[in-house]
């Protein structure tokens, strides 16, 4: 039971927890807002990491070590950004699973914008994974970008353009850093559209009850 008369005297966190929400939705509806929180954390930590990062194949790994060892609270920024990315994907897969289970895909505009968001997010994560330029980064960059060569006629040209040459080298890392930096802004824009489209029709109603049943 929520005593609405006393809500004005409660702490902000308590007010947030007591936010009146219809009984016809559950905890599974929290993950959209959790994703926005993850996005804000990633952009904030990513900005401070980008200040100290060097997009050069000879210095990239050393710059990551420098961030972790020498930059004040750099180790927190680096770990939060890395672990936050994993949390981001956990939240988004639960968010998608809820949508599939409850039939949110019937709201086509919201679903298509969300699918596009997932593709951009996966691309952003891939570019970020390459940036430390360790052994696994180099392997990932080589294997994943080589998939472009499977595209008929244009594949080899696209791969050469993405690499900035005939092999993965310094221009590749520079391009990946630029893409990793710019794509989150595309995610912000598309997330805004995703939310606007959602509130245009409203979320689905899993129990089939009246929205104002409470």
UniProtKB/Swiss-Prot annotation:
Compartment(s) where it occurs, according to its Swiss-Prot or TrEMBL record: Mitochondrion inner membrane
Top-level taxonomic group: Eukaryota
Principal location class: mitochondrion
Topology within the bilayer: Multi-pass membrane protein
Binding residues for heme b b566: 95, 194
Keywords from the UniProt entry: Electron transport, Heme, Iron, Membrane, Metal-binding, Mitochondrion, Mitochondrion inner membrane, Respiratory chain, Transmembrane, Transmembrane helix, Transport, Ubiquinone
Binding annotation for a ubiquinone: 199
Cofactor note: Binds 2 heme b groups non-covalently.
Record field: transmembrane: 31-51, 75-96, 111-131, 176-196
GO MF, any single term: ubiquinol-cytochrome-c reductase activity
SUPFAM superfamilies found in the cross-reference section: Transmembrane di-heme cytochromes
Cofactor list: heme b
Pfam families per UniProt: Cytochrome_B (PF00033)
GO BP: mitochondrial electron transport, ubiquinol to cytochrome c
Quaternary structure and partners: The cytochrome bc1 complex contains 3 respiratory subunits (MT-CYB, CYC1 and UQCRFS1), 2 core proteins (UQCRC1 and UQCRC2) and probably 6 low-molecular weight proteins.
Miscellaneous remark of the record: Heme 1 (or BL or b562) is low-potential and absorbs at about 562 nm, and heme 2 (or BH or b566) is high-potential and absorbs at about 566 nm.
Record PANTHER family: CYTOCHROME B
Family: Belongs to the cytochrome b family.
Function: Component of the ubiquinol-cytochrome c reductase complex (complex III or cytochrome b-c1 complex) that is part of the mitochondrial respiratory chain. The b-c1 complex mediates electron transfer from ubiquinol to cytochrome c. Contributes to the generation of a proton gradient across the mitochondrial membrane that is then used for ATP synthesis.
Descriptive protein name: Cytochrome b
Species annotation: Crotalus atrox
UniProt lineage: Eukaryota, Metazoa, Chordata, Craniata, Vertebrata
Primary gene name: MT-CYB
């Amino acid at each position: 039971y929520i005593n609405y008369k006393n809500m004005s005297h409660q702490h902000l966190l308590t007010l947030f927890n007591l936010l009146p929400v219809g009984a016809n939705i559950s905890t599974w509806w929290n993950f959209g807002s959790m994703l926005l929180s993850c996005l804000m954390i990633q952009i904030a930590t990513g900005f401070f990491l980008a200040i100290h990062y060097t997009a050069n194949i000879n210095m990239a790994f050393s710059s990551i070590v420098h961030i972790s060892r020498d930059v004040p609270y750099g180790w927190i920024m680096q770990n939060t950004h890395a672990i936050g990315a994993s949390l981001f994907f956990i939240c988004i897969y639960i968010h998608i699973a809820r949508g599939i289970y409850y039939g949110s895909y019937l709201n086509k505009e919201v679903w298509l914008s969300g699918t596009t968001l997932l593709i951009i997010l996966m691309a952003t994560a891939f570019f970020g994974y390459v940036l430390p330029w360790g052994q696994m980064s180099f392997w990932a960059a080589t294997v994943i970008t080589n998939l472009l060569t499977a595209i008929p006629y244009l594949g080899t040209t696209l791969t050469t353009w993405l690499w900035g040459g005939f092999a993965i080298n310094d221009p590749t890392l520079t391009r990946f850093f630029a893409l990793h930096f710019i794509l989150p802004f595309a995610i912000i824009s598309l997330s805004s559209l995703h939310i606007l489209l959602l509130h245009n029709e409203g979320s689905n109603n899993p129990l089939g009850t009246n929205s104002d049943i409470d």
